[in-house]
Amino acid sequence: MGGSESTGRKVSFGMDEEERVRVLRGVRLSDEVVNRMKDSNLPSKDQSTSTASGTTSGPTTFPSKAGPSASHSASTSKDGAHKPTARGVGHQYAEEDLYRRYEKEQALIQEELARLAKREREAAHERLSSSVLREKNITSQERRKAEHLPADLDEWAKELEQKEAELQRLNTFYREQLNSIEKKNLEIYKLTAEQFHTAASNAELRVKQRSYDPVCMDLQSNILKCYAENKQERLNCSDLAKEYGKCVSAAQKNLLFNHG
């Protein structure tokens, strides 16, 4: 719609009493309008011919828009005070031609400004339509979210209840397992303590039951007596010493056999 061409262009214009656009600032004419204005500045063949005929045929009547010099020439010609010359007629025609070109340029500018204003209106309409459509989409999305919100809340509540039930079940299970482990540890401790006390009691009984009575007391007394009597000839007591050694060995074997 022409919105892309007018993006970034700021045009300020106003309307006069005849509903014509007057440029204030910020107007950039297109190349087409500039070319048309250049073409309008070049004099046409008809204008050259009419200029030549005007210089040879005498006074000519022109429109009232020719300006003050044309009105003055017409009045002086009517009164008969001064007759128009070729130079005066050429000057008058040049002013009229300049005015006509001015009018044509103004028409081109009016056309260009009208086209720019139309583009600006279309671009503004496009932007407004896009904004309205975007707001409608956002409103529609928010409405759909609001419609689905209660259902989502119910679903979330159910999920939370299920998670709480699962956590409660796991808590109960782990508590039961902990109690079972504590009971087993207590039973093992009691059994170990009982076994320890039993083993200690048995060891104490075994130690108390053992008696270490002197062995071979008669032979020991005889050897001591023999040594005392035969201080210089102790070899005489060798037989008693051998018998004492045999007696001690036999007593050791008997002790190991009974308590082994």
Curated annotation (Swiss-Prot):
GO terms for cellular component: MICOS complex; mitochondrial inner membrane; mitochondrion. Residues 213-255 form the CHCH domain. It comes from the Eukaryota. Keywords: Coiled coil, Disulfide bond, Lipoprotein, Membrane, Mitochondrion, Mitochondrion inner membrane, Myristate. InterPro entries: MIC19/MIC25, MIC25. A lipid is attached at residue 2 (N-myristoyl glycine). Component of the MICOS complex, a large protein complex of the mitochondrial inner membrane that plays crucial roles in the maintenance of crista junctions, inner membrane architecture, and formation of contact sites to the outer membrane. Belongs to the MICOS complex subunit Mic19 family. Metazoan Mic25 subfamily. This is MICOS complex subunit mic25-a. The lineage of its organism: Eukaryota, Metazoa, Chordata, Craniata, Vertebrata.
